């Protein structure tokens, strides 16, 4: 359900009429070559579209207005081939609503020592042209990503690729509809938040629906739809004997399949990209959606448990960002600890809803009791997650602003089998260690729900926070509690002043 085939970033190159026809012809020629090279890069998942060299305030304003109104344009990569007086850019940058990446490069990689002359110097001026452009961006307090290096360098293309993936996620949030099926889990604080401010800040709309809105679709499920989905379950997962045809718990799997078909139809009809539910508002549903939610997440939907719409939206955004990359992304919860004198770890899991995109093999499909909710035993996929680097991401509402918290972690193989644990899980080592990471996370007000991603890194989240204009707190191998507390205190002052325009 994630289609990025029509998405594009525009390559906009700055110059001025001063240089004359021949120089400007070469500027355009070089710019088109660079745009084609970036467009062909395997690191950049979207189209890179060359736009004409802009040489005047009116041309700059026009291209920024066009970018704002073009639905397929998700951002602009800007480069100053020559010197482009930056006062010309004020009007355009002031109205530009799309994310901007400043590429500080030049057409040639090396200086042609034997032939360099003043014609070459006048043509290749990005070393100071981009500094002029950088000044006006900073003067306007315009958040942007800056990428420095030769455009053919893999490092540069990778950074541009990361930024383009982030703006894909940002573009998704601008149009995202989140369905809250039921309300927030009663008395829970961190999953609450200002949905109006969220729509102003991120673009996403969050609205509530009753479980009966989904029940209408469940009741329309046909025998053929049901049989087809059960066949998919049987081929995709290792079903326990009790769930196979004629098994004692087969009816539970059938009911889970009905819920998936109904829930999927509800989401498709409403154009929703993310959803929440809660075990306290299930209505006539016979079980909490387990395998249904897991499979919907695997198909790209965002999800948050217990009404957690912020995490649901972020799961969706990160799933869009990581399309085509190795590794998965899932709704997650810090569940329990493994404290030892040598090393301490977190076991992440949830009641049911961990995405199989992070599974280390073919999941097992099982039915077990669920101690809360008062419903029948739900079906779910059970698996471990592979070892490797990952991040946990939490978006929280601090009252005066949104705060994004990131903890870099390393997943490890569980120290033993978990034969009696009937849920999907992942064991990780927090950076720099559990003691510092958990202290910092708690001081930051980080949620117990997170987005866990094997494919997205902190750099993505840094770019995202800049685009969104929100606070970012990173917990990594360099974090100390003292410096982290200072950062929180400094941010309180910064964001107060920034938001009041002082």
From Swiss-Prot:
Keywords on record: Arabinose catabolism, Carbohydrate metabolism, Isomerase, Manganese, Metal-binding
GO BP annotations, alphabetical order: L-arabinose catabolic process to xylulose 5-phosphate
Entry's EC annotation: 5.3.1.4
Residue stretches in coiled coil: none
Cofactor notes: Binds 1 Mn(2+) ion per subunit.
Family under the similarity heading: Belongs to the arabinose isomerase family.
The protein's name: L-arabinose isomerase
